[in-house]
A protein has these predicted regions:
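Membrane-proximal stem/loop segments at transmembrane-domain junctions that anchor or position
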Residues: 359-485
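Short acidic/glycine- and proline-prone juxtamembrane loop motifs at membrane-interface regions
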Residues: 260-271, 310
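Transmembrane-helix motifs of polytopic, lipid-linked glycan transferases
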Residues: 218-239
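Extracytoplasmic catalytic/substrate-binding loops of multi-pass membrane glycan-assembly enzymes
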Residues: 162-174, 182-198, 202-211
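Membrane-interface anchor segments at the N-terminal boundary of transmembrane helices
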Residues: 27-46, 211-215, 452-537
Length: 566
């Protein structure tokens, strides 16, 4: 790493003290202008402190005059700065005010300075984590210890608090499909089949549905513990400092939402584990840590298969990773070939096979979350709508109805209005006029469209929002599935979880946007250094892209669980 940095420092310069002071003032200005934000302000303050530290450190070092690199650094920083303004646009309204425009300009320059200094520090100053000098000859012991303790913690939680597992409305829909044999792909069919293997086994052996659900919960505990321990073992073998190993292990084992998710029957949990499995296996194949790679190849294939089958956007992740590997060079030919096979099999299983089985998807409305929100926002804002557009809107509902059900952070009410309308069938039969309607209204009301998009997606790229993270118990059902009555252990754990969510010091653990930007920074820095680790960031960035164009909820933590793990 030091050689790479030295190579980039051939032409360097030292910045003047006044310039550094101006940048520090701008960073503080950025923080001051968003102090009334509805996001996690502590996360913003933490980011600002990081920017101040990096600015001071950069002042003590000579930075290169690499024009191309600096342009890319400034472009990346501009995107960060602009996103912080857009995510808090309500603090700068009305936009016609000269004072607010001046505040926006200062805030933008502050974010630009903050981002630029952080990236410059990571590219040219940060020495990197030093690998441990002692020999690491016991990876098996590390894996076994990590695995055993995580399994023990999660099993205790399952047995004492959430037996036989946590089942929400979506989970109960999957259980209903398994019991009745009437399947759909609203929740991924192959995930439902995976749950069904354990549910049916439990019913076969005990005749009790509770044991069927419990068997799946136990499988998920073992699966996640294995994925987590595989990551910890890899860091151990690569010489990560002991404090880093303990911090990563504690993040997997002790953060409350990790424990709850281990027994929650959601597609997102297994999918996120597969994302971590694929990422770690890919890293080990790019940088072999053992002479025998057969196990890593097997886990790489299993992780890729899980991504393809357990959530619909997994196929896009594999496709983009395949393209990146193909463009990265011939030395990745074997990896690309394996991914290509995984992708083809996934496409067949999720396409023609489901069609032949007569299994239908979630419906058109589920793919229209953001377009529907944008049209509803125009109605909500009371903007003037052209007569031709008004007539087409009324085939679904009156503008007043759209305005009445619109919620800026959730598309379900608007989607429900669409499904109940007589115009829904017309939309499915002939979507082109409605597409043209959406485009015309966007050109006439760009501000309303932009606000609707920001409010619907900002939880995934802004500093973080207080929104539900975990579920508990079993959703009301007709199968007699009930949770175990509450006890003192469950009460204490629930209070700890709530306190953790409320404590500002813990907010970085719950900030999706913080993890998103950290992932983006890792991708950018590694790409600039021409290190293949940038590929490890792709799974989350592709998932993020899918959320930005179609999320139904503005800050659904489980949707972002892959980045929390990886």
């Amino acid at each position: 790493m030091r050689k790479e940095r030295d190579a980039m420092n051939i032409h360097s310069c030292h910045r003047s003290k006044p310039a550094v002071l101006v940048q520090l003032v701008l960073i503080l200005s950025w923080l001051t202008h968003i102090q009334m934000t509805d996001t996690y302000f502590y996360v913003c303050a933490l980011i600002a402190c990081g920017g101040i530290f990096c600015t001071c450190e950069n002042y003590r070092h000579n930075l290169p005059r690499s024009r191309g690199t600096w342009i890319r650094v400034l472009l990346f920083s501009a995107v960060f700065s602009l996103s912080s303004i857009l995510g808090n646009y309500s603090l700068f309204e009305p936009f016609t005010s000269l004072t607010n425009l001046f505040r926006m300009a200062l805030s933008f320059l502050g974010g630009l300075s903050l981002g630029g200094n952080v990236l410059a520090y990571l590219l040219w100053v940060f020495p990197g984590l030093q690998a441990a000098e002692e020999k690491r000859n016991h990876p098996g012991r590390v894996f076994a210890l990590s695995f055993g303790v995580i399994v023990l913690i999660d099993l205790v939680y399952l047995l004492l608090v959430e037996w036989p597992g946590v089942l929400t409305r979506d989970s109960m829909d999957q259980i209903r499909q398994i019991i009745t044999g009437k399947y759909s792909n609203a929740n991924p069919y192959w995930h439902t089949v995976t749950v069904g293997i354990f549910v049916k086994l439990g019913l076969l052996v005990t005749g009790d549905l509770h044991w069927g659900v419990a068997l799946f919960s136990i499988f998920q505990i073992l699966y996640l513990a294995g994925c987590f321990s595989y990551a910890v073992m890899t860091l151990y073998q690569k010489g990560a400092p002991r404090w880093c190993l303990w911090a990563v292990w504690a993040g997997y084992a002790l953060i409350p939402y990790q424990i709850v998710y281990s027994v929650t029957v959601w597609k997102d949990i297994l999918f996120s584990g597969a994302s971590l499995l694929l990422t770690v296996a890919l890293y080990r194949l790019l940088y072999p840590v053992e002479k025998e790679e057969k196990r890593d190849w097997i886990l790489f294939v299993l992780g890729g298969a899980g991504l393809c089958l357990w959530r619909t956007n997994g196929l896009l992740v594999i496709a983009m990773l395949l393209m990146a590997l193909a463009l990265a060079g011939r030395k990745n030919k074997k990896l690309a070939a394996v991914l290509a096979v995984i992708l083809v099999i996934g496409l067949v299983l999720c396409g023609p096979v489901l069609s032949l089985m007569g299994i239908r998807g979630a419906g058109l409305a589920e793919t229209l979350s953001i377009p529907l929100q944008q049209v509803a926002r125009v109605c909500y804002d009371g903007a003037a709508i052209a007569r031709e557009d008004l007539e087409l809107i009324r085939t679904v509902a009156e503008p007043e109805e759209f305005a009445g059900v619109y919620q800026s952070y959730l598309s379900d009410p608007v989607k429900g209005l669409l499904r109940r309308s007589a115009g829904y069938e017309q939309l499915k039969a002939d979507p082109l006029p409605y597409l043209k309607l959406w485009l015309r209204m966007g050109l006439r009301h760009p501000i309303s469209y932009l606000k609707a998009w920001i409010d619907q997606t900002k939880g995934y790229w802004n500093a973080g929002y207080s929104y539900w993270i975990t579920a508990e118990g079993i959703y009301e059902n007709e199968f007699g599935l009930v949770s175990r009555p509450g006890n003192i252990v469950g009460t204490v754990f629930d209070k700890l979880m709530r306190y953790a969510e409320l404590m500002p010091l813990m907010h970085p653990l719950f900030s999706i946007g913080l993890y998103t930007w950290l992932t983006g920074i890792c991708c950018f820095v590694n790409r600039q250094r021409r290190r293949p680790e940038w590929l490890l960031s792709l799974p989350w960035l592709v998932i993020l892209f899918g959320l930005l164009i179609g999320t139904p909820v503005y800050a659904e933590f489980r949707y972002a669980y892959p980045v929390m793990l990886a």
